[in-house]
Amino acid sequence: MKFIVKPHPEIFVKSESVRKRFTKILESNIRIIVKARTQGVAVFNRRDHIEVTSNSDTYYAEVLEILTTTPGIQQVLEVQQSSFTDLHNIYEQVLELNRANLENKTFVVRAKRRGKHDFTSIELERYVGGGLNQAIASAKVKLINPDVTVQVEVVDELLNQVIARHKGLGGFPLGTQEDVLSLISGGFDSGVSSYLHIKRGSKVHYCFFNLGGPAHEIGVKQTAYYLWQKYGSSAKVRFIAIDFAPVVAEILEKIDDGQMGVVLKRMFMRTAGMVAEKFGIQALVTGEALGQVSSQTLTNLRHIDNVTDTLILRPLINWDKEDIIRLAREIGTEDFAKTMPEFCGVISKSPTVKAVKEKLEEEEAKFDFALLDQVVYNARQIDIRDIGKESLEKAPEVELVNSAEEGNAVVLDIRSPDEEDESPLEIVGVEVKHLPFYKLATQFGDLDQSKTYLLYCSRGVMSRLQALYLQEQGFNNVKVYRP
């Protein structure tokens, strides 16, 4: 197994020193994730590309997923490796692989060579190119701007040929930009805005203002954990949960109805700014889009920004909602967002779309700002890698079982449809049902509640989180299946 990783082109327009630093960080990021999720896979930095190789194809699918979801990669070339006897044997193998693709096309052969051979790279290109030109009557050699470039690499006694090209995420390697703190709610907007900053190379830490109790926090943790695991697991990031119920209660009691929405957002930004300063984070990220709700007019956004010196980034400011949802679908956060309740919109019945500074300050004079210090002091922060462990510690009643032999038990495979199709779960003598995790909130109650359900996922994190969530909803017939 061999992959050639092409870094994003923006990296190569940097100065030589910056380019080297970025590619070194990209190499390190790939190595960290590969080491955590595979065995026997090596990563090499080759100046203008990175090679990922193994003597086995065991982790082919896992490595390909890693490379196509790691920021900073433009393209992943899949390479077929084979042995060869001589120059003519190389030509025969190249012809076999490329014949169909070269019909009625112009082409050029580009070769690279490492090791001791009785031919040069130029001789290899000419021999293979001439042979292809003779063997495929409709093909024609064209050295400049051909339809197809046939890439051939010879390393010692191995022939490497590109057999597939996979699109990468683009962007910059994670950690090449400064850290940001994302105000995550679990909805469409905050998930997409977090992803965009991961893609651009920032380590994204998560700040969650809890307005909806334990079930809401569990749902948001699932979203944050998914984003980290899928796109940013080379980085150590924090998840900070703040119980904002006391602040909301104070607003409901003391603030004029029309000002509540803007005041709440100002309290969010004040508090998040305090958290960012505590951890040395340079900017806040929100999912706000211009005009999407009443608090997101230019006037209101300006008043919201003015309460903190911390930079506020809004990557979705000019996005249409359907574009946000489409990207959420592409990156895998849509299903989380669809089942996430919205709490912010209920606190103001007649929100102002054009707040006045003096009126806001008059209303906020009634507010006990000591509450903000209190909620920051009481905030809980965890390493995002420990979300699975925390869910287990906080819910010891969620039983883990490694056998599905209970007579009344059904194994409930909660993986996504793609995962289930790729690796179906089959257990002899045991009923297995498939219900994706994102449908549990709405469809678990429709199942036969006289049975016990053993929740299964690949790594055991999502199943524990979902079991905890279901128990919060009053379902006590759930366990976690870890064979």
From Swiss-Prot:
Pathway: Cofactor biosynthesis; thiamine diphosphate biosynthesis
Binding site for ATP: L183, I184, K265, G287, Q296
Entry GO MF terms: ATP binding; CCA tRNA nucleotidyltransferase activity; tRNA binding; tRNA-uracil-4 sulfurtransferase activity
E.C. number(s) listed in UniProt: 2.8.1.4
Gene3D superfamilies xrefs: 3.30.2130.30, HUPs (3.40.50.620), Rhodanese-like domain (3.40.250.10)
Location, primary (coarse class): cytoplasm
GO BP, one annotated term: thiamine diphosphate biosynthetic process
Compartments, record wording: Cytoplasm
InterPro entries: Rhodanese-like_dom, Rhodanese-like_dom_sf, Rossmann-like_a/b/a_fold, ThiI_AANH, ThiI_fer, ThiI_N, THII_Thiazole_biosynth_dom, THUMP_dom
Domain THUMP as annotated: residue spans: 61-165
Active site: C457
Key words of the record: ATP-binding, Cytoplasm, Disulfide bond, Nucleotide-binding, Redox-active center, RNA-binding, Thiamine biosynthesis, Transferase, tRNA-binding
KW Cytoplasm (keyword) present: yes
Disulfide bonding pattern of the chain: C344-C457
SUPFAM superfamilies named among the record's database cross-references: Adenine nucleotide alpha hydrolases-like, Rhodanese/Cell cycle control phosphatase, THUMP domain-like
HAMAP family documented for this protein: ThiI (MF_00021)
Protein task: Catalyzes the ATP-dependent transfer of a sulfur to tRNA to produce 4-thiouridine in position 8 of tRNAs, which functions as a near-UV photosensor. Also catalyzes the transfer of sulfur to the sulfur carrier protein ThiS, forming ThiS-thiocarboxylate. This is a step in the synthesis of thiazole, in the thiamine biosynthesis pathway. The sulfur is donated as persulfide by IscS.
Family: Belongs to the ThiI family.
Protein name stated in the entry: tRNA sulfurtransferase
Native species: Vibrio cholerae serotype O1 (strain ATCC 39315 / El Tor Inaba N16961)
Gene this protein is translated from: thiI
